[in-house]
Swiss-Prot record:
UniProt enzyme class: transferase
UniProt protein name: 2-succinyl-5-enolpyruvyl-6-hydroxy-3-cyclohexene-1-carboxylate synthase
Subunit note: Homodimer.
Gene from which the chain derives: menD
GO biological process annotation, one example: menaquinone biosynthetic process
Keyword terms of this UniProt record: Magnesium, Manganese, Menaquinone biosynthesis, Metal-binding, Thiamine pyrophosphate, Transferase
Example GO molecular function: manganese ion binding
EC identifiers of the protein: 2.2.1.9
Catalytic activity: isochorismate + 2-oxoglutarate + H(+) = 5-enolpyruvoyl-6-hydroxy-2-succinyl-cyclohex-3-ene-1-carboxylate + CO2
Length: 589
């Protein structure tokens, strides 16, 4: 009997070897029969951590979270039929947020296709244009050419997931029976060592992407523009890499004298420098300040800003905009960029900083003075209601409870907006991630679990109740994987963000509640029970902080904070009004 029980075992082993040699370190496997060879190969491959997740949709987002945190491709495995289709939302998010993901879809053999065989659907290019690369690896064959071709194709697929713009790739893998490692002789002796074992310690085909070095002459031109312009801002949108970006942005801001507008998920807001603003959203809602502080030059990094008002301010400023794209994407829907600089954002910052030494002038001091007024007003407004847990206060307290380096995942909709608007930037570095590619609320709990799993430490998720219910099955995933996570769920019994949109003013109240407010009345303690989570229901800021800190010690925790949707709208208006009033008519320096 050969060292591999049968040809399927050999084929799957070789496939997983190439994935690991290409940099994959995590595999997420969903149960299924046709995928048995792949599942067993995942479990038996050295250097690969394998996670078992029952539900494919949860598995896809769990793998996405693994890849977002580790910045290395994760592999996710499904059996034949509709199983792989449940990965579609995660694949879309991976494509739009540039996260490397390898999807393995097991398949029935060619002779069963198109003849009504059970659990058999067309799986070719399952994910359409959302996949960076697709290949059908073909039926396992005991021939050198077939095995070597398969290994080389897998190596190419991994590089395609890694290479900018990063994203998901699909490998379709058909198997005939036997699917279990049952002894079935095949001509192993006729296979070369290269076909059977590949190149030890390296992919069969090593494809080296070009170095992401920004063009020096373009950077020289941008540096000249900076030197000629005092009225500039640095804008940092969503960006997953923690590669020294915060320090590089801090150095650039101090060299240029430009204030920094950094989102929570930019990896530049926490651990940044003295010119990193906390409350630019509130400041720019104040028309006199916004008009007096229109920039002439904008240096943009990462994706587009989540808050609407700052983005409108930028789009309407008429400023010369330079977009730095280190992920291969063009996040410029308003087409304001006159120049796009591709390559490492950190390298670009470092190159621009050399030769610039303007320092902090009147332009930046105007922003800092306004920031201090707004900060004082916000703190006073919160102090008036010291024991009230409003949605803005929840976001603020969650961040305050986190130690340096703590992983935080944030849901789309209101949580990410409240974090940006009401939680101050700080010098303590935090790892903050969100699914801001498609901006959906699906798979949020699963993504956070993947983040925590890759981080190897307890993480915190800040989410709304609808996003939690959308992914409530992830509590089963949490229970089975034993990944430590603290879920802070803002429960306003529905979709709170719709109360801020025009539809809330024009739709009849009953219609609005039925179609948009969507009150559910679900007792979230059942979600906690589903995963064996410890349930906390804090009612004060102090109690919330305590619950989050307890959760960070380990285990699965659900921290439910009940709030009123209508009161939430009033509180946002109260806080923004207080912050705006603090700015007055100027001057602000």
């Amino acid at each position: 009997m050969s060292s591999d029980a049968n040809l399927n075992v050999l084929w799957a082993r070789a496939l997983l070897e190439e994935l690991v040699r290409g940099g994959v370190r995590h595999a997420v496997v969903c149960p299924g029969s046709r995928s048995s060879p792949l599942a067993l190969a995942c479990a038996g491959t050295e250097g690969l951590r394998t996670w078992s997740v029952i539900d494919e949709r949860s598995a896809g987002f769990f793998a996405l979270g693994l890849a977002k945190q580790s910045r290395a491709p994760a592999v996710v495995v499904a059996t034949s039929g509709t199983a792989g289709a449940h990965f579609y939302p995660a694949v879309i998010e991976a494509a739009l947020s540039h996260v490397p993901l390898v999807v393995l879809t097991a398949d029935r053999p060619l002779e069963l296709q198109g003849w009504g065989a059970p659990q058999t659907v067309p799986q070719a290019r399952f994910f359409g244009e959302h996949a960076r690369f697709y290949a059908d690896l073909g039926q396992p064959e005991a021939h050198d050419a077939a095995l070597i071709h398969m290994r080389a194709t897998v190596a190419r697929a991994v590089v395609s997931a890694w290479r900018a713009p990063r994203g998901a790739v699909q490998l379709n893998v058909p198997f005939r029976e036997p699917l279990a490692p049952i002894a079935e002789p095949f001509p192993e002796a006729s296979l070369s060592a290269l076909a059977k074992s590949g190149r030890a310690g390296a992919p069969l085909t090593r494809i080296v992407p070009p170095e992401p070095v920004p063009d020096a002459s373009t950077l020289d031109e941008v540096r000249r523009r900076i030197a000629a312009t005092t009225r500039g801002v640095i804008v940092c949108g969503p960006r997953d890499e923690m590669d020294g970006f915060a320090a590089a942005i801090s150095a650039l801001s101090q060299a240029t004298g430009y204030p920094v507008l950094a989102e929570s998920t930019s990896q530049a807001r926490y651990g940044g420098g003295p010119l990193t603003l906390s409350y630019y959203d509130a400041m720019l809602r104040h028309a006199p300040f916004a008009k007096a502080h229109r920039p002439e030059l904008v240096l943009r990094f990462g994706g587009g800003l989540t808050p609407k008002v700052p983005q409108q301010w930028l789009d309407g400023s008429g400023a010369d905009t330079v977009l730095f794209s280190d992920g291969g994407g063009l996040f410029d829907p308003a087409h304001r960029a006159s120049t796009v600089v591709e390559g490492s954002a950190v390298a670009a910052c470092e190159a621009l900083t050399r030769g610039l030494a303007r320092g902090v002038g009147a332009w930046a001091r105007g922003f800092l003075a306004a920031e201090q007024r707004v900060r004082t007003a916000l703190e006073a407004a919160f102090a008036e209601q010291p024991d009230v847990l409003s949605e803005p206060r929840i976001a603020r307290e969650v961040v305050a409870a986190l130690p340096a380096g703590a992983p935080l995942f944030v849901s789309s909709s209101m949580p990410i907006r409240d974090l940006d608007a009401f939680a101050p930037a700080g010098t303590v570095p935090l790892r903050v991630l969100a699914n801001r590619g498609a901006n959906g609320i699906d798979g949020i709990v699963s993504s956070a679990l993947g983040m925590a799993a890759a981080a190897g430490r307890s993480a915190v998720l800040l989410t709304g109740d609808l996003a939690l219910l959308h992914d409530v099955g992830a509590f089963v995933t949490a229970s089975r994987t034993r990944v430590p996570l603290t879920v802070v769920a803002v429960n306003n019994d529905g979709g709170g963000i719709f109360s801020f949109l025009p539809i809330a003013q024009v739709a009849p109240r009953d219609t609005f509640e039925t179609l948009f407010g969507t009150p559910h009345g679900v007792d979230l303690s059942h979600a906690a029970a589903l995963g064996g989570a410890r349930l906390h229901r804090p009612e004060t800021p102090v109690a919330l902080r305590s619950a989050v800190r307890e959760g960070l010690e380990g285990g699965l925790h659900l921290v439910e904070v009940r709030v009123d949707r209508n009161a939430n709208v009033d509180e946002h208006r109260r806080l923004f009004a207080r912050m705006a009033a603090s700015l007055g008519e100027g001057p602000w320096a």
